[in-house]
């Protein structure tokens, strides 16, 4: 909603906002209105069971999309690959048992850390496959990639676009534009404030 009012939206009425931070979720706008579903929980994209990977999601289920395409998945995979002998600018921090944050990984990416870039591109590819399904179903004009990992820019955006071209129907995706959020990691916070303000004035 924040992106809809103050970000990348320029008249589009059918939009999917993908928030890729520690977790993974989406916001859906249909005909200019937020779609919340019956109970208000629409958009739990990260908990679509997509993988037979036996990785336990924080929701208590196994194989959720979030276990392969989120900030938490990125940190887990980075630590797994370092444990298998691969080298990263963050290797010393991992060996010293210092907790890693997404800011650390983004900073390493900006310094051309090959492992971090590779992992982010892999997450982009996984996301793109599943965003393809959303595009086929909802036929949005605009898909906005936001959240912490959107700060990696083209490293995550280009694999998403490539996967969408590969896995979605051309008749549908030709009307869809995919962009990085203007508001970045602040879109959710700004959107919450704007929704609260809107509801206050409605009352």
State where each predicted segment sits.
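Active-site neighborhood for divalent-cation/phosphate handling
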Residues: 1-3
């Amino acid at each position: 909603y924040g992106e809809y009012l103050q970000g990348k939206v320029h008249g589009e009425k059918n939009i999917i906002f993908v928030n890729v931070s520690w977790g993974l979720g989406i916001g859906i706008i249909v005909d200019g209105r937020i779609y919340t579903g019956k109970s208000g929980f629409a958009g739990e994209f990260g908990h679509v069971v997509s993988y037979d990977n036996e990785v336990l999601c924080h929701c208590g289920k196994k194989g959720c999309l979030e276990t392969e395409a989120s900030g938490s998945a990125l940190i887990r995979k980075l630590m797994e690959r370092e444990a298998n002998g691969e080298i990263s600018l963050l290797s010393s921090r991992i060996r010293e048992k210092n907790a890693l944050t997404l800011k650390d990984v983004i900073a390493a990416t900006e310094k051309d850390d090959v492992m971090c870039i590779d992992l982010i591109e892999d997450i982009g590819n996984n996301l793109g496959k599943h965003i393809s399904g959303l595009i086929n179903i909802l036929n949005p004009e605009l898909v906005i990639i936001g959240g912490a990992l959107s700060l990696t820019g083209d490293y995550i955006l280009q694999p998403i676009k490539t996967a969408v071209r590969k896995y979605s129907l051309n008749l549908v995706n030709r009307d869809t534009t995919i962009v990085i959020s203007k508001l970045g990691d602040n879109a959710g916070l700004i959107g919450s404030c704007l929704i609260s303000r809107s509801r206050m004035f409605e009352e």
